[in-house]
From Swiss-Prot:
Keyword set, alphabetical order: Cytoplasm, GTP-binding, Ligase, Magnesium, Metal-binding, Nucleotide-binding, Purine biosynthesis
Gene that this sequence comes from: purA
Taxonomic path: Bacteria, Pseudomonadati, Bacteroidota, Flavobacteriia, Flavobacteriales
Catalytic activity: IMP + L-aspartate + GTP = N(6)-(1,2-dicarboxyethyl)-AMP + GDP + phosphate + 2 H(+)
Protein family per UniProt: Belongs to the adenylosuccinate synthetase family.
Span of the signal peptide: none
Protein's recorded name: Adenylosuccinate synthetase
Function: Plays an important role in the de novo pathway of purine nucleotide biosynthesis. Catalyzes the first committed step in the biosynthesis of AMP from IMP.
Amino acid sequence: MAVDLLLGLQWGDEGKGKIVDVLTSKYDIIARFQGGPNAGHTLEFDGQKHVLHTIPSGIFHDDSINLVGNGVVIDPVIFKRELDNLAKHKIDYKSKLVISRKAHLILPTHRLLDAASEASKGKAKIGSTLKGIGPTYMDKTGRNGLRVGDLELEDWKDRYRALADKHEKMIAFYDVDVQYDLKELEKEFCTAVDTLKELTFIDSEEYLHQAMKSGKSILAEGAQGSLLDIDFGTYPFVTSSNTTAAGACTGLGVAPREIGEAFGIFKAYTTRVGSGPFPTELFDEVGERMGKVGNEFGATTGRKRRCGWLDLVALKYAVQVNGITQLIMMKGDVLSGFDTLKVCTAYKYKGKEITHLPFNIESGNIEPVYTEVKGWEEDLTKMTDASSLPKEFNEYVDFLEKELETPITIVSVGPDRKQTITR
C-alpha cells in the first residue's frame, strides 16, 4: 500500500496532532519523518489535553504502531518526559513505539550551542526554540552526529564525549554569557538514554518497506509547517529540516512512487510564532480576538502566536510544492461572530500585483490585497455534521476550494476529536 502524508501548510501550529489522532484508526503505522521537540502536537479527548513533541500522535490508539523516522532528531531527556507522561495515563507505549537507528540525538551541548548562537545574533535573532535542533542538524550534515543506533555500541560514551568536547570549544568561541552545569545536564541525559534503550530500535526503511509489501497502511506525520521548510520556507526564519512532502521520502526512506494521498492542513486564518515575515498579520483588536478565542499560544514554547487573515497566496504555494490532494481546514469556529472576513488573494510587490510567493516577503516589501467574504454568527462548536453548518461558512469553504483548486474534505470546529466534520 501507499504512504499517505499529513502536512502543515502554514507556519506550523495548524492542528496536525488532532487530525492525526482522528485519522489514526484508518492506519496501521503512524510515522514522524522530520523535526524534533521544537514541534508540539496538541490532542484533546475525553476531557483531557495531551501535548506530544517527538512521539507520533497515534500513540493513544491501541491498534497502531508509532514510528520515529531517521529524519527526526531526538532529545532523550524530553523524550523521557513524554514517556513518563504516557505511563502516568497508563498508555502501554513499549508495545507500539519503534525508533529508527538512523535518527540523530540532541545532546545537552546542542541546546547550549543553540542558546549561545541565538544570543550572539543580537537584534538579528531568528526566534529559535532553543531546543538544540539547528546544531543537531548541523552535526548531521557535517557528519559528526551521534545516532540512536550508536547507543547499541560499546563505545557510545566515547563518541558522545568527543562530540560534547567539540561543542564546548564552539560555545566558548561565541563569547556570550551562557550559564550551565554540564555535569548535571549529562547526568540527566544518561538517565534518559537508559530509558530510550528500553525501546525497540529498528532499521526503519526496511521496516516500512516490509510493511508496505504486506499491505499495511501508513500515515507519515509532518511537524511544523511548509512555510518553515529549510528550502521552501521564509528563509532564514525557518526550521532546519524539510517539512514538505519531499521530506517524508528522505526522512523515512520511502520512494516517491510510494506516496499516495497528501493531506494538507491549514487554519481558517493564519498564525505564526516567533520572528519572520507575516504579510497578513493584524495588530488591532481583530488579531487580539483571534488569538484569545483561538487560544493561540505555542505548545512547545508557550509563546503568544501572531495572528492575521488567511493568506491564500502563501497557501496556494504550499499546496503546489507539496502536491496536496485533499485539504483539511482547522479552527473555523474561531471566526464565528465576524460580520466580514478578509482573505489575501494577491500581493502588491514592487509596484505590481502578483499572485505568487516571491523570493523576499520581508515586512515593507509586501502589501496584501484582500477579498472580503461574508461572515457568520453561529457557534460552530456544537455542530456535528455538514448539513448543520451555516450557509455563510459553507460559502467561505467553497470560495477557498475554488481558489486553491483542491477539495476541502474535513473541517474542524473545536479542539476535541469529536468536533470534526467530514464534507
